[in-house]
Regions:
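N-terminal "arm"/small-domain region of PLP-dependent enzymes with the aminotransferase-like
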Residues: 1-61
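PLP-dependent aminotransferase-like
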Residues: 101-159
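PLP-dependent aminotransferase class I/II
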Residues: 215-292, 296-299
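Active-site pre-lysine segment of PLP-dependent enzymes
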Residues: 124, 141-152, 165-188, 192-225
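PLP-dependent enzyme catalytic core of the Aspartate aminotransferase-like
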Residues: 173, 319-358
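Conserved PLP-binding catalytic core of the aspartate aminotransferase-like
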Residues: 137, 280-281, 289-324, 340
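Short beta-strands and strand-loop turn motifs
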Residues: 130-134, 156-162, 188-192, 299-301, ...
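Phosphate-binding glycine-rich loop
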Residues: 63-108, 126
């Protein structure tokens, strides 16, 4: 008897992407905060909202499939040729495109773990084998082990810096050594989704380093610092052959009319954006200092979140957080990632974590 459509056997082994949990409805008057998805607490810049309203009048038309104006804006902002830029529906879409354009059955994709949850998913969807390399005990990438994991079957390497969820960075020296050790036919993606929040001068500079390598791409997003998570826009910067491969695997008309206009407008007011990012970085410092003053172990972060390596206490802390009106991101048996959010949310988090550790 026909039981319905037959799907690829490999799908049974692929976990679904698990997004940050939304707060449960409350009836006790306590304001609930979602600090589980690394979202920007600020709304889009005023001029961006205006552009969104204007663009809404044109959604009866297909968007520019080549995102020409947005690509021009990104190229000017980054100081790179337009031929070095590809855009897509969020950085995660580009992760899919990198996997689809480089790897298939019998191939391997290497990445640190724990890191961005999409890496093993996009690898498996492409039919390739994920190779997860454990982080160091301090939450940093083990770059020597990452290089050692590259074999003749490796087609793609993801490096997340600042790393999600630990907030640690790969240094320029580490990246240079890694690129020198990896064959130039292996694609390396430096995922800089949180780079605007980084203040570590030793952190790898993707936009400088990619110019020296045909096989290095830089991945960025408008979801975090720019506060456009709901519009889904990400971009990659790499040499033209890489961009051509990404464009061949892109979803046609993927970036909407509104998303293209809003992202381009977001690049036009650097001063206000920097002020907002600086405010979040200052809050990150305040939160980190408050936690450490209370004896809470917290990893030094260069992103818009902090990581508590709670181990077996993770679930208990997540449950207490939920009860207190804070929905955090828990990774069972490992730790909790908490977004730097509104001041009230940050204050509640400091108090909760302090009480928990005490």
């Amino acid at each position: 008897m026909n039981s319905g459509p037959r799907f690829r056997d490999a799908l049974q082994e692929i976990p679904g992407y698990r997004a940050g949990k939304r707060p449960d409805p409350r009836t006790d008057g306590v304001e609930a905060f979602k600090v589980s998805s690394n979202e920007n607490p600020y709304p889009p810049l005023p001029q961006v909202v205006k552009v969104i309203e204007q663009a809404a009048h044109h959604v009866n038309r297909y968007p520019d499939p080549g995102s020409a104006e947005l690509i021009e804006a990104i190229a000017a902002h980054a100081g790179v040729p337009r031929e070095h830029v590809a855009v897509a529906t969020g950085a995660v879409a580009l992760c899919y495109q990198f996997a689809q354009s480089t790897a298939g059955p019998g191939d391997e994709v290497v990445f640190a773990w724990r890191s961005f949850e999409a890496y093993p998913i996009v690898t498996s969807v492409a039919g390739a084998q994920p190779v997860a390399v454990p982080l160091l005990a301090d939450g940093h990438h083990d770059m020597a082990a990452l290089a050692a994991a590259v074999t003749d079957r490796t087609r793609l390497v993801f490096i997340c810096s600042p790393n999600n969820p630990t907030g640690t960075v790969v240094t320029q020296d580490e990246l240079d050594e890694f690129m020198a050790a990896v064959p130039n036919d292996v694609m390396v993606v430096l995922d800089e989704a949180y780079i605007e929040f980084c203040r570590d001068p030793s952190a790898a500079a993707g936009l400088v380093t990619y110019t020296k390598h045909q096989n290095l791409a830089v991945l960025r997003t408008f979801s975090k610092a720019y506060g456009l998570a709901g519009l889904r826009v990400g971009y990659a910067i790499a040499q033209p052959p890489v961009i051509e491969a990404l464009n061949k695997t892109a979803l046609p008309f993927g970036v909407s009319v509104i998303a293209q206009a809003a992202a381009a407008a977001s690049l036009a007011d650097d001063a206000e954006l920097r002020a907002r990012v600086d405010a979040l970085v200052a809050e990150r410092t305040r939160v980190t200092q408050g936690l450490r003053a209370a004896g809470v172990e917290v990893v030094s972060s260069e992103a818009n979140f902090v990581w508590l390596p709670l181990g077996e206490q993770t679930e208990e802390f997540a449950n207490r957080s939920e009860q207190a009106g804070l929905t955090v991101r828990a990774f069972a048996g490992e730790g909790v990632r908490v977004t730097i959010a509104e001041t009230a949310a940050n204050d509640r988090f400091i108090g909760l974590a302090s009480d928990f550790s005490g």
